[in-house]
């Protein structure tokens, strides 16, 4: 089974192995997905830079892929990772650290 990339990008929800805490949301195109499978590290597509990026390539805060899950429509993916260091570029463990309610 493979994601449906007919719209170009799919959301990739990254969760932490063990706790299942949501770490971040990014987007994958087919190339990022294939590189993620090949390297077992997360690759995403930057909408602002219009290019692929490897999480932790410059910061050292890498994500080692443990498993991948497709949703029922095959147009979004959950990436289960072993996180090294914080996931958020702000230095927070997760990008979802602002509580609203």
Swiss-Prot record:
Q: Which UniProt keywords apply?
A: Amino-acid biosynthesis, Cytoplasm, Histidine biosynthesis, Hydrolase, Magnesium, Metal-binding, Zinc
Recorded catalytic reaction(s): these are: 1-(5-phospho-beta-D-ribosyl)-5'-AMP + H2O = 1-(5-phospho-beta-D-ribosyl)-5-[(5-phospho-beta-D-ribosylamino)methylideneamino]imidazole-4-carboxamide
Instruction: State what protein this is by name.
Output: Phosphoribosyl-AMP cyclohydrolase
Organism name: Bacillus cereus (strain G9842)
- Give the GO molecular function terms: magnesium ion binding; phosphoribosyl-AMP cyclohydrolase activity; zinc ion binding
The enzyme's E.C. designation: 3.5.4.19
Q: Which domain of life is it from?
A: Bacteria
Q: Which cofactor does it need?
A: Mg(2+); Zn(2+)
């Amino acid at each position: 089974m493979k994601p449906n990339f007919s719209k170009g990008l799919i959301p990739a929800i990254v969760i932490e192995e063990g706790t299942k805490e949501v770490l971040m949301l990014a987007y994958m195109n087919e190339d990022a997905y294939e590189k993620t499978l090949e390297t077992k590290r997360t690759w995403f597509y930057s909408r602002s830079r219009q290019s692929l990026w490897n999480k932790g390539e410059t910061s050292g805060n890498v994500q080692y892929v443990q498993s991948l899950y497709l949703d029922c429509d095959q147009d979004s993916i959950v990436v289960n990772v072993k996180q090294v260091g914080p996931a958020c570029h702000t230095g927070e463990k997760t990008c979802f650290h602002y509580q609203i309610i």
